[in-house]
Amino acid sequence: MQYTQQELNQIINSGQKPLWLNNADLSGADLHGADLSKARLLRANLSQANLSEANLSWADLTYANLSGADLSSAKLKATTMSGANLNGAILTQAILEEADLSRTTTIKADFSGANLRGANLSEANLSESNFSHANLREANLSETTLDSANFSQADLSQANLRESDLTGANLEGANLDGTDTEFAVMPDGTIDN
C-alpha cells in the first residue's frame, strides 16, 4: 500500500505503538526524526527514504527494501533487518548496537562512524561497504562477504570473522585484538587457520 506524506505523518503521530506497516510502500518518504521504535515494517519498501535521525530501535525490518535510504544518525538498537536490502544505504553515525543484519544484501553501503557493537551481520554480503571508524566490537561477521570493504580505523576487537571473505578489504589501522579470523580469507587472499 502506498501512503501519501500526509497519511504517513498522521499514522506516525497517532501515538499507536507498535505501528504496523508490513508490506507498505514508503519509497522516497521523508521520515527524518520519526519515532518508529518497535514498528513492524516486514517487507516494506523504504528505498530512497529519508530516515536520518529516526528512531527504529527494536523495529522489525525483516526483508525490507532500504536500498539508497538515508539512515544517517538513526537509532537502530536491537532492530531486526534480517534478509533486508541495504544496497547503497547511508548509515553514517547510526546506532546499530545488537541489531540483526544477518543475510542482508548490503553492497556499497556507508557505515562510517556507526556503532555496530554486538551486531549480527552473519552471512551478509557487505562487499565494497565503508566501515571506516565504525565500532564493530563483539560483532558477528561470520560467513560474511566483505570483498573490498573498508575497515580503516574500525574497532573489530572481539569480533567473529570466521569463514568470512575479506579479499581486497582495507584493514589499515583497524583494531583486531581478540578477533576470530579462523578459516577467513584475508585481504591478500590467504586463509587464516
Question: Where is each model-derived feature located?
Answer:
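Tandem repeat scaffolds
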Residues: Y3-N193
